[in-house]
Amino acid sequence: MSTLIGTLGSGVSALRTFMKGLEVIGNNIANVNTSGYKSSSAAYSDTFSNILQRSAPSSATATNTAALALGTGVKLGGISTNFSQGSLQNTGRSSDLGVSGEGYFHVKNSGDGTEFVTRDGSFRWDDQGKLVNNQGYRVQGLTGGGLGTVGDITLGTPPVGAELQSVSFDKSGNVIEFYSDGSSATTNQVLLQNFTDQSALVKEGSNLFSGMLAAGPVGAASGSFAFQVGTGNAPGANGLGSIQSGTVELSNVDLTEQFSDLITTQRSFQAGSRLITVSDTILEDIVNLKR
């Protein structure tokens, strides 16, 4: 009887676990058109086993004894993120920035000072001349006279008697402003951040990641997460990718793979459900034997 109860428990663990797997797959499919989205995948592992007999080494009078163990079900072993690059799509807006290669944009919430990184370069200029993302978080980089200050990417002041006509970004992240008098100036540089362990980054929604310190920011001061002047966070340097203005990175979700995983996970869920049904039927038969 206890074995059948254990079988029921295994079936229940399968339903709970594979439901979570279906949630992961469903979230990937739902974000197939989300800029900068990184797909996730679920991994499964067995739960603690009931040891019926422990193994024993061979001796002069007996051969070795194999262990006997009964599994108790399945559990979610972990959820991992696929950080591979998605395709770059042209948008026609110069403030949209894609990264061809490694690196993340660094954005900051000016309200509470929280910082995040993202691969979603859907940026715009706000009414204060700040380069911001869709949530209004400010893009960080080099700014100020001689580009010697780390802070918000901010439009510069046009020359006396001139007006700002257009803004462009080169592959190194330099912000080049063009004025009505025919002059131009490099006023900012968008920087990128790379990590020694991307798997430590935490999804926060809105295509943002936190957990930068745990991920090991390359070039940051010890115990902090901030760009450092002259430490090689420029796009195209030290293994970082280049900036592609007028593009955004698409989701890296592979629909073919997701639908395949959906089918296999659904079958696993159905098998767990069937296990519960069969165990219940056997228990009912046993109860009826006592009548």
Specify the residue positions occupied by each region the protein language model found.
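Amphipathic alpha-helical polymerization modules
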Residues: 1-144, 158-291
